Amino acid sequence: MANLLEKFKNRDKSLLFVPFFVSGFPDFDFLEKFLFKNKDKIDILELGVPFSDPVADGPILQEINYRAMVKGVNLNNTLDWLLDSGITKKIDVILLLYFNLIQNKLEEKLKRFKEVGIKGLVIPDLPLEEAEKLIPLFNEHNLDLILFISPTTREERIRKILDIAPSFLYCISVKGVTGERDRLPEEGVAFISRVKKETNKPLVWGFGLGSSYQINSLKGLVDGVIVGSAIGKRLLNNEDIQDYFDELYKATL
């Protein structure tokens, strides 16, 4: 097992900050410099491996995926970059990728992830039944398989997920795909409030976050926050994201 659960348990701040970036965007050099500069602010880095059909993503992250793929970014050079840069020695990294990328020679790839220092995987297109079968194999390679729950998940499946989840729960708090929203959805807040009563596993709010106000509003409800599209939008616009990143981080304290 990876140490992600311990990280939540032993945190000395209100929320763990989990920024999401797509590998190789805008380029590896920018990402490396930015991540090392901000390593003490990043509790867990969620790094997306570019994919041609990222079904969980909205238009911003779809565009970023496309641009990264055009540049030739893929799973292999992402892993090479992580290893060569030493990022995983300074930051806990989880990869978001689609099962197509790893299902062939799966065990060989899991061994590679462990060698690189990856702590866990988020696989949006992996059915729950398949995930349940794979958790022991992931555990053997010291990798957390991070499972999703959402307001549209059936009650019996929620109970199943809460029972088998080896790590924190990635809470999809809104219907639809990724993307920054103006306010927190009442349905998502109510859903997570209910789930919180049923489990002691950490809950991390994903999808729709983009402001320090929203993050502050989640204190006491969840254990961590993921911010992706809002960061990606600013990168697409060639904005300097440092001040914005600092603002998000401070809201998690």
Swiss-Prot record:
Q: Tell me how this protein assembles.
A: Tetramer of two alpha and two beta chains.
Query: What is the gene called?
Result: trpA
An example of a GO molecular function for this protein is: tryptophan synthase activity
Q: Which family does it belong to?
A: Belongs to the TrpA family.
This entry's Enzyme Commission designation comes to 4.2.1.20
Q: Give, as one word, the top-level EC class.
A: lyase
Which sites are catalytic? 46 (proton acceptor), 57 (proton acceptor)
Q: Which Pfam families match?
A: Trp_syntA (PF00290)
Q: Which reaction does it catalyse?
A: (1S,2R)-1-C-(indol-3-yl)glycerol 3-phosphate + L-serine = D-glyceraldehyde 3-phosphate + L-tryptophan + H2O
Question: What is the protein name stated in its UniProt record?
Answer: Tryptophan synthase alpha chain
Q: Name the pathway.
A: Amino-acid biosynthesis; L-tryptophan biosynthesis; L-tryptophan from chorismate: step 5/5
Alphabetized UniProt keyword annotations = Amino-acid biosynthesis, Aromatic amino acid biosynthesis, Lyase, Tryptophan biosynthesis
Where does the record place a coiled coil?
none
What does this gene product do? The alpha subunit is responsible for the aldol cleavage of indoleglycerol phosphate to indole and glyceraldehyde 3-phosphate.
